[in-house]
């Protein structure tokens, strides 16, 4: 089980019926920036055999910031009865946000390729303060720079957030290319390589 001295700083609040791939990308990139133990993502962070409901609410309490990740289906997702999940008092997304408010956590709405911020009149009364919180948008065509911008802002806002400037993916490496021309060596910029890379003479 997780120790009392948890490293969790960022809690990802998201709806599984919404943009699951988007939130997985967000977790991957923020984990690369700050370390995987720093970011709580339920499908990654809850240990086998753990009480998953207690684990989620404990993680909200331990975190410094709760990112409310909103895709295009976040607000309109419905349950088996055809009612909006966000209106259900037992909805976990709703309960996590309300707990974050109750505990005075920094709550940051993150829009995944959603052009407009959520409106107060579209939210249940208990969550309407989400509409006045400063949010950040992650665009489909600008996801990389947008997530980098989010990470930079989080680093400014959250005390003690670990800094990890380089990607940690085992499948990514860097090399520096040199060219020899007339005895002169020219050094080029670093390049990230995914998969196998062979450096050597070319034979036909």
Question: Where do the language-model regions lie?
Answer:
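Long, low-complexity intrinsically disordered regions enriched in small/polar
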Residues: 164-204
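C-terminal helix of von Willebrand factor
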Residues: 139-158
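Short amphipathic alpha-helical segments
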Residues: 23-25, 78-82, 121-123
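Conserved N-terminal substructure of TIR/SEFIR domains
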Residues: 1-73, 89, 101-103, 145, ...
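Conserved TIR/SEFIR loop-to-helix hotspot centered on a Trp-containing motif
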Residues: 51, 72-105, 115-117
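Glycine-rich, charge-decorated loop segments at or immediately adjacent to ligand/cofactor-binding or catalytic sites
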Residues: 116-127
């Amino acid at each position: 089980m997780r120790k009392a001295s948890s490293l969790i700083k960022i809690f990802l609040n998201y709806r599984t019926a919404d943009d699951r791939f988007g939130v997985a990308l967000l977790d991957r990139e923020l984990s690369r920036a700050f370390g995987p133990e720093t970011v709580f993502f339920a499908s990654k962070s809850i240990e086998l055999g753990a009480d998953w409901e207690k684990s989620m609410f404990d993680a909200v309490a331990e975190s410094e910031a709760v990112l409310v990740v909103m895709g295009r289906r976040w607000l309109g997702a419905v349950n088996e009865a055809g009612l909006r999940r966000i209106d259900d008092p037992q909805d976990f997304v709703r309960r996590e946000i309300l707990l974050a408010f109750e505990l005075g956590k920094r709550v940051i709405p993150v829009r995944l390729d959603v052009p407009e911020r959520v409106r107060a009149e579209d939210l249940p009364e208990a969550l309407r303060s989400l509409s006045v919180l400063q949010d950040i948008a992650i665009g489909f065509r600008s996801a990389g720079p947008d997530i980098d911008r989010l990470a930079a802002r989080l680093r400014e806002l959250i005390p003690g957030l670990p800094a990890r400037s380089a990607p940690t993916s085992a499948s990514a490496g860097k090399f520096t290319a040199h060219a020899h021309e007339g005895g002169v060596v020219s050094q080029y910029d670093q390049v990230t390589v995914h998969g196998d890379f062979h450096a050597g003479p070319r034979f036909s």
